């Protein structure tokens, strides 16, 4: 059913009495060259055939997906589906994460890089993503919180993390992770390292860095092995610190990162941590799930199995085996 989700109190009571499941799709109408809008009737039909009373909301600008998710929580939807890129998913998560009642989360990846969807094994095909929503399984996963904001995939700081919004969307679509690699080489000569203090689970790093990453998954900026030991539901972040480097160092480390071998490089610190505190001596932007998240400093806290997300049955079985 295509509507704006404005149920009356009577509708909500009747639906609950009938035991009907309710799904709310929050979608970015501009993502993926507006491809999702063309498939929306099919998606609604699939969900309704699976027993969901379904409605949708098209976002109108920055922050709107967060507002829409908060409304969906208030109206006690069983499932909230984020259809868009990593930015849309991040906004939806920020609307759900701080609430006492948290609906299950579904993902339809129609953005450019779709890092989080790749990490949980949700394919780019809209039909295949719908298969997971109606035939898959929901599993609890960790979330990250920093400075009263939430992230589901990655947080970081340092000029190199700004690659995610420096690289044009068209170039990301055509070249994938190579676009980040090339942009990094272009930017590096003009980048000055930043002096930081990073505390992580009783340890302390002090020195100049090019970037730091706080990862919840293994998929970052199109690189699927940047945090190779990452687990979504273990209550731990993967912390990656790239020390001061020159161009030759960067090219070597980026090449190793394609194979997940960068974590052994002497210019890289890689560790597991539940809580990470970062202090900076200079101005440093905070990047949350590929979007601008304000300025550092910040304290990153892992929220253990804080939200349930739909994945394929195979992926769910693997995650349960690891936990």
Task: Label each residue range with its predicted role.
Residues 156, 160, 213-226, 292:
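Glycine-rich phosphate/pyrophosphate-binding beta-alpha loops
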Residues 87-101:
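Short Gly/Thr/Asp-enriched flexible loops that form oxyanion-binding sites at enzyme active sites
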Residues 50, 59, 98-210, 214:
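Catalytic core of DAGKc-family lipid kinases
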Residues 29, 83-85, 110:
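Glycine-rich beta-strand-to-loop/alpha-helix junction loops that act as flexible
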Residues 171-179, 228-248:
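Gly/Ser/Thr-rich active-site loops/lids in small-molecule metabolic enzymes
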């Amino acid at each position: 059913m295509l509507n704006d989700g404005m149920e009356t109190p009577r509708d909500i009571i009747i639906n609950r009495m009938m035991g009907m499941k309710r799904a709310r799709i929050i979608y970015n109408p501009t993502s993926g060259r507006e491809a999702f809008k063309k498939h929306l009737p099919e998606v609604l039909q699939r969900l309704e055939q699976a027993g969901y009373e379904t409605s949708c909301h098209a976002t109108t600008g920055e922050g709107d997906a967060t507002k829409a998710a908060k409304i969906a929580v208030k109206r006690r939807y069983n499932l909230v589906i984020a259809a868009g890129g990593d930015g849309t998913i991040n906004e939806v998560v920020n609307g759900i994460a701080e609430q006492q009642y948290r609906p299950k989360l579904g993902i339809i990846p129609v953005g450019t890089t779709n890092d989080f969807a790749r990490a949980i094994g949700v394919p780019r095909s809209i039909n295949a993503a719908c298969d997971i929503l109606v035939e898959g399984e929901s599993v609890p996963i960790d979330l990250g919180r920093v400075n009263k904001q939430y992230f589901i995939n990655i947080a970081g700081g340092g000029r190199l993390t700004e690659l995610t919004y420096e690289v044009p969307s068209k170039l990301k679509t055509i070249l994938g992770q190579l676009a980040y690699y090339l942009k990094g080489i272009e930017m590096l000569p003009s980048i000055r390292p930043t002096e930081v203090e990073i505390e992580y689970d009783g340890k302390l790093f002090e020195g100049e860095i090019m970037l730091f990453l706080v990862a919840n998954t293994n998929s970052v900026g199109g690189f699927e092995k940047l945090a190779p030991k990452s687990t979504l539901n273990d209550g731990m972040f993967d912390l990656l610190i790239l020390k001061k480097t020159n161009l030759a160092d960067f090219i070597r480390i980026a090449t190793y990162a394609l194979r997940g071998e960068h974590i052994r490089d002497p210019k890289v610190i890689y560790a597991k941590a539940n809580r990470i505190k970062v202090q900076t001596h200079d101005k440093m932007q905070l990047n949350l799930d590929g979007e601008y998240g304000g300025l550092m400093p910040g304290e990153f806290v892992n929220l253990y199995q804080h939200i349930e997300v739909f994945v394929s049955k195979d992926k769910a079985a693997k995650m349960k085996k690891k936990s």
